[in-house]
Amino acid sequence: MDYHIAILNADTPMVEITSAYGDYADMVKSLLQSGSEYYSTEWNLVTKTYEVYKNPNDYPQKEDFPNINAIIITGSKASATSDAPWIKKLISFVKDVLFKYPHIKIVGLCFGHQIVAKAAGVPIIQNPKGWEVSSTVVQLTENGEKFFGRKVININQMHQDMAVDVPEGFELLGSTEDCEFQIFYKPRQALTFQGHPEFSTEVVNTMVKVLRGTEVFTEQQKEEALKRSENPADNDFLAVSIVKFLLE
């Protein structure tokens, strides 16, 4: 069967990433391909990327909505707290899909997780505990254990903003020590991660090394992040989980 996914691309990574691993939309496609292979699904995945951070008019048209099965919102170095016109437009679009077109599933990754939360009425703030970086243990809630079939998962992180609550109608599936609201789930409609299931260990380590010693990461933060990456994220498992959600 054809399964149509609109990828709302919210940024271009640093050149050190794009030259080796592609952009965020490419990483999402790789994630979906990986999940499809492990899940052994026979869907014919059809993706179209919309560069929403570049062009405020580059969105799926309403007449296309009946044929769209899902949207995926990528990560971004931009903040979901920003009043930038393109971010306001993105929040408005996601809110429209969330409340008016429930047949369209939504997956949000990091910035995308925050955009979905904000579209559902939850404020986003800068985490007073600072950055959360690299492979991080997510402790699953009771609902999270039911959804994933395990008690903990490791997810790559690269963020300093966070949601402050669970959106109405959503379930909280997991938390970390520094960020309580890590994974949101609305049955048969939305699945969002504060982390980056689409980031490989190599992608995270490259980002950390490029940003070390800058105003973003200190040398100590870099060393700690690289050490945590020795306990790799459960990317294959997460890819399968996302595909299973899309096929619910």
Curated annotation (Swiss-Prot):
Gene3D superfamilies referenced in this protein's UniProt entry, alphabetically: 3.40.50.880
InterPro entries, sorted: ChyE-like (IPR044992), Class_I_gatase-like (IPR029062), GATASE (IPR017926)
GO MF assignments: hydrolase activity, acting on carbon-nitrogen (but not peptide) bonds, in linear amides; transferase activity
UniProt KW Transferase keyword: yes
GO cellular component, one term: nucleus
Keyword field: Glutamine amidotransferase, Transferase
Domain Glutamine amidotransferase type-1 stretches: 13-217
PANTHER family per record: GLUTAMINE AMIDOTRANSFERASE YLR126C-RELATED (PTHR42695:SF5)
Name of this chain's protein: Putative glutamine amidotransferase-like protein C13C5.04
Originating organism: Schizosaccharomyces pombe (strain 972 / ATCC 24843) (Fission yeast)
